[in-house]
Amino acid sequence: MANVALIGATGMVGGHILSTLLESPAVARVDTISRKTPPAAASAPQAKLTTFVSDDTSRWASQLSALTPTPSIFMSAFGTTRAAAGGFDNQYKVEHGLNVEMARAARDAGTKVYVLISSSGASKTSSFAYPRMKGEIEDDVKALGFERTVILRPGLISGQREESRPAEAAVRFIAGFAGKIYSGLKDGWAQDADVIARAAVNAGLKALEGDVPAGSEKVWVLTGSDIIRFGGKN
């Protein structure tokens, strides 16, 4: 059975990842590290879930390093917004810096599988700041040399966020409407948060078992159609 550590558990995708992990019989223990208590913690079995809550993110890596037993899978759904961070430079420092720092701590602790929720279009050569940042995160964590790295690149993420993002909410409404007409209209460019979460957990567990596609033994990248396939309800 897997022991899993998770950052980003209070976000839209991360919250669904946590719920999926708690429901999975293949997962023995879940440790979350976050700024606030994940909503799912209120009803989670204490024997399976341990939460570490601190606004001081400089404490997160040492907390991850000290986890016993060592997580066999480390998952990151952590991210922030330009507005919340106070500009893109700060967003980069927080999102890129913390993701890479935590991945390195997990690698050094002996974690075998790393799972990252990235973004469609992520590329360090992108002309746009956000996908370029996502691409740089991907490249930097791949360079750490986990036994297996799993990267999910969803398109627009459909679902309910706690924070207000009016423009994104409008596009999510269009995606939802398109999905009601025909699911294929949406699935190519938008995926539901719970589907992404299930795909992340399923892919992480498969990677731990060594059950990955040929040619993806070290790095396995899942895009829209893969996410839909692995995120389906069993």
UniProtKB/Swiss-Prot annotation:
A Gene Ontology cellular component where this protein is annotated is: mitochondrial outer membrane
Which BP terms from GO are recorded? import into nucleus
Transit peptide start-stop: 1-28
Enumerate the subcellular locations listed in this protein's record, separating them with semicolons.
Mitochondrion outer membrane
Q: How does it sit in the membrane?
A: Peripheral membrane protein
Task: Name the keywords, alphabetized.
Answer: Membrane, Mitochondrion, Mitochondrion outer membrane, Transit peptide
Q: Which Pfam families match?
A: NAD_binding_10
InterPro entries per UniProt? NAD(P)-bd_dom, NAD(P)-bd_dom_sf
Q: From what superkingdom does this record's organism come?
A: Eukaryota
Protein family according to the UniProt entry? Belongs to the FMP52 family.
Protein name (record): Protein fmp52, mitochondrial
**Which organism does this sequence originate in?**
Aspergillus clavatus (strain ATCC 1007 / CBS 513.65 / DSM 816 / NCTC 3887 / NRRL 1 / QM 1276 / 107)
